[in-house]
Amino acid sequence: MLLCTIHLCSCGRYDCTFLARSEFGVRISVWRCPISKVAECFIDRFVEEHFYDSLDLNQFGNTKGRSTLTALILLTHTLFNYSDDSHNFVRVLFVDFSRAFELIDHTVLADKLSLYNFPPHLKLWMLSFLYGRSQFVKVGNNCSKIVNTHAGAPQGTRAGPSAFKIIINDLKLTLPTIKYVDDVSVVSVASDPGNLDLQNALHELYDWAILNGLTINTDKTKEMLIHFGKG
């Protein structure tokens, strides 16, 4: 990984690098082998075909035939169904995970690849793509030591979203949940705004995140309260 100053430009015009912003406000440029990018396209197709039947129906991210639009349609339809009763309060929790792709636990991923009966060659390819990576940081003329990474997926790869979808697939809460890769929306309805169903679901989500080596970003996790009453 290389940290350096980069002039921002259209990613559509210049596809040679992937740009991301670190938590320190520094632009991260990740250079990848062109052969690796081509190979990823083929492998990602096989991964999607194998995993499609096991994929959570409420997962809409990076999936053929599903999109942000279909996710919003489902959310709107869910809210509309609750609007018939003017006494209902609907609470929607929009959950964000901190550095989701960077914190992908390779051991957790290996266990879930086995859980979903991935063929050995696909499992080995995904794990070998992530295992044994090293990185260093360069700022100006100064370079850090080279260190090995034990978690995460390289930024801008197809493997990142695919691996995260596999990890989050078994996230099942007691309340309706809509997923878009690493973004999760949880919907609760009650006649009493002080109902604790959403809080209990949040505890479930927190426990699941700890078990899977992930962290909820409390700064970006927001709640929206909706009431259909008049006046």
Model segments located where?
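Short, conserved micro-motifs composed of acidic
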Residues: G140-C143, N200, T215-G231
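Short beta-strand-to-loop capping motifs
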Residues: V186-A190, H227
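Short helix/loop segment flanking the catalytic signature motif in cyclic-nucleotide metabolism enzymes
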Residues: A190-N200
